[in-house]
């Protein structure tokens, strides 16, 4: 019996897959537990439309992420911090500091976990930092740390 999986089923397939399951397995387990529904022409057509809509939505999200990456590449986030001799900072500049300053300076709101900063910035100067905007879309942002007067 052909069924459309509504949830991931171990050993059978992922959500949205159309699979052949034995009649007994489908009637006694998959259908009553609402893990799958019978694959009729109407339900297959609906599934196809849903997948098309999801693909279009994902493409739009990727396009938005690419536009944002382009915009961020032109941004220079300036952060002032207290520093000692040799340009070493008292404390450090974290991803949270960078995101807050980016929001104040440019009005761009991002999640601090998207900033791919391995370790906090501990010295004066400029640094390019990667930002993961979407799966497969990584932007770069320039962060300049200057000495506070």
Swiss-Prot record:
Pfam families from the UniProt entry: Ribosomal_L9_C, Ribosomal_L9_N
One GO biological process term: translation
Swiss-Prot/TrEMBL keywords: Ribonucleoprotein, Ribosomal protein, RNA-binding, rRNA-binding
Key word Ribosomal protein present: yes
Alphabetical list of SUPFAM superfamilies matching this protein: L9 N-domain-like, Ribosomal protein L9 C-domain
Record family assignment: Belongs to the bacterial ribosomal protein bL9 family.
Keyword RNA-binding: yes
Designated name of the protein: Large ribosomal subunit protein bL9
Annotated function: Binds to the 23S rRNA.
Gene Ontology molecular function, alphabetical: rRNA binding; structural constituent of ribosome
